[in-house]
A protein has these predicted regions:
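Active-site-facing alpha/beta catalytic cores
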Residues: 3-250, 293, 301, 318-322, ...
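Non-transmembrane, aqueous-exposed alpha-helical and coiled segments at domain scale
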Residues: 227-230, 234-236, 242-274, 280-330, ...
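Catalytic cores of Mg2+-dependent Asp-rich isoprenoid enzymes
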Residues: 383
Length: 383
């Protein structure tokens, strides 16, 4: 029920809004990659869970077992992989229809964003929204409207997930008849999680053998030497666009870890794209007992990520958020000021807390401001 057509549409809609705001702020194209159509396996820190004295296998995602704490529900069920595949295929078909059928029209996307800025809580973002309106009006006056420029009605949208359940990934791997290389058919981009990035591990071995773009989560325990080995294994040809490093440290800790990893990349002359996962390092247990992520901590980590790249002379290439198009109350803060007491109202996640639609769009505006400032500073330095 969490993957109905309406919920997929709403998440896609918010991602389009975020991408438009970021494109305006950065003045460069934004590649849109959604953790959709395949994100059914969950990494867990412990193999079992104890409730009321009963110990059962941990919930590992709907592709393996069920969330309900009962022996039958927690028993791994291979048929769930077939169900996950069917769901992923249906989701991908729906995303294709949304991205090419007119739903993604740039003017419609901006009208949704204007609706967000009309609220009193979001009034600080109205100036940027109006500037985007002016830019679109100029394009129309210059003859670049949706009728005369059909590309304004469509977007390129890609899917991604953690390549965790190798039995599933291997079953969907195909030999590309054009290139003669292996291709992971479960998604456009796959990534290796912080728990499975051992250089001699099975997940690294699988990912290095496929030609898809690969993401690599880099956490506080990632050493410079391990990163060098992983870069050589995953991108031996040093190909542009092949390897994305996804930094996940937590607010207040980015400065302790990111600079040494940047230096390791520079020492190797490695061609990578740096992105910021500001979610996983900022998970806390609220006073009300719910696992949550404070909006302020997420924003702080993003700003630290940008500041360090500015100091190192490197490029911050992307942001990675766990989000939904639903009006959930799973992360605290934001323009609607979700509090600890509000979390129980609409806490729907089965695993990690997600940003809701307004929090996600607000973050996009704030990141766009960072991108604008960076662009202005760069222009000033180059004269």
């Amino acid at each position: 029920e969490q993957f109905s057509a309406d919920l997929i549409r709403d998440t896609f809609k918010v991602m389009l809004q975020m991408a438009m705001v970021l494109t305006y702020g950065a003045k460069v194209p934004v590649v849109k990659v959604g953790r959709m159509a395949g994100q059914f396996a969950k990494p867990r820190s412990a193999p079992t869970e104890v409730v009321g004295g009963m110990e059962l296998p941990s919930y590992r995602g709907d592709i393996i077992n069920e969330l309900a704490f009962a022996p039958e529900a927690r028993r791994p069920n291979p048929s769930k992989m077939l169900q996950a595949y069917t769901q992923a295929a249906a989701t991908l078909n729906l995303l294709r229809a949304f991205s090419t059928g007119g739903y993604a029209d740039v003017h419609q996307v901006h009208s949704w964003t204007l609706g967000f800025t009309e609220s009193d809580q979001a009034k600080e973002y109205r100036d940027m929204a109006r500037s985007i309106s002016d830019a679109l009006d100029f394009m129309t006056a210059a003859g670049l409207d949706s009728e005369r420029a059909p590309s304004l009605q469509t977007v390129d949208f890609y899917t991604s997930h953690e390549s965790l359940l190798l039995e599933y990934e291997e079953a969907l791997t195909r030999l590309d008849s054009t290139s003669g290389k292996w291709l992971a058919g479960s998604g456009h981009m796959i990534w290796i999680g912080d728990r499975t990035r051992q250089p001699d591990g099975a997940h690294v071995e699988f990912c290095r053998g496929v030609q898809n773009p690969i993401g690599l989560k880099c956490g506080p325990t990632t050493t410079a030497e391990d990163l060098k080995v992983l870069m050589a294994k995953l991108n031996p040809e040093n190909e542009a666009g092949r390897l994305t490093l996804i930094a996940r440290f937590g607010a207040g800790k980015v400065g302790d870890h990111l600079p040494r990893l940047i230096k390791a990349v520079q020492q190797e002359g490695a061609n990578v794209l740096w992105t910021c996962d500001a979610m996983h390092g900022n998970t806390i247990k609220s006073s009300s007992g719910y696992k949550t992520r404070p909006f302020e901590s997420v924003l702080r980590e993003v700003r630290e990520f940008f500041a360090i790249h500015n100091a190192e002379g490197t490029v911050p290439g992307g942001v990675h958020f766990e989000m939904t198009g639903q009006d959930v109350t799973e992360c605290t803060g934001g323009v609607r000021a979700v509090s600890d007491e509000d979390l129980s109202d609409r806490y729907h996640t089965a695993c990690d807390p997600r940003l809701n639609a307004s929090q996600s769009l607000e973050l996009a505006f704030l990141v766009a401001e960072e991108l604008t400032q960076r662009r202005v500073q760069t222009a000033a330095k180059t004269g």
